Amino acid sequence: MSCLPALDKFLQNYHQAYLTSLGELPRYYPQGEPSVCIQGEFHADLDQAVSWQPVKREVEGSFANVEHALELTLWPEINHFYGQYFSAPLLFDSEWGTGELLQVWNEDDFTCLQQNLIGHLMMKKKLKQPPTWFIGLLDEGDKMLTINNSDGSVWIELPGEIPTQQLSPSLAEFIGALSPRIAPPVKHEELPMPALEHPGIFASFKRMWQNLFGKR
């Protein structure tokens, strides 16, 4: 079962929750990055939050280059989850805690996603672990949410470790169990990680790595 209907519904509920509770669209710090998602004026040189809404992509994002580079067939849900919309990260509440689903802010963000996905999968191969790919963060970035590439199930994963806790048998069921979380926009400080420079998707992963390794 495709996760796209569940993602469509969550996006609709997400924006309706903000409109109902706050009377406004959700806001996000783009850190100078343009996007078709931005509603209203945008000034790249001003450090301010923008109102946004998801925009359906005219051409679906493709991961064929990633599959070719790694000689690996990816679980097809990756195209539905990351290739259908431009969107800011989506905050959620769940029975497993609070977190966020990663999404793609613009085409540059999509390129960064592909590059970092390749890096993640190469690391899994080097560690002789089954391939996974990430969809979000849990518990303020302390844990990754990943997909088992062999069957599409959703797991909690710590970098460098094999996932041990399954959350859902499918991405569609997982998204269906989430509730939108209403919160003010948070500006995330840039960390010195050159490989993850783009402020869209991987600002979230910068926080995760800082939280994980800053505690050791």
Swiss-Prot record:
Q: Which residues form a coiled coil?
A: none
- Source organism, top-level taxon: Bacteria
Q: Which Gene3D superfamilies match?
A: Syd protein
* UniProt keywords, alphabetically: Cell inner membrane, Cell membrane, Membrane
Topology in the lipid bilayer: Peripheral membrane protein
Its annotated compartments are:
Cell inner membrane
Q: Which InterPro entries match?
A: Syd, Syd_sf
What job does this protein perform? Answer: Interacts with the SecY protein in vivo. May bind preferentially to an uncomplexed state of SecY, thus functioning either as a chelating agent for excess SecY in the cell or as a regulatory factor that negatively controls the translocase function.
Q: What is the protein name for this chain?
A: Protein Syd
Species source reads Shewanella baltica (strain OS155 / ATCC BAA-1091)
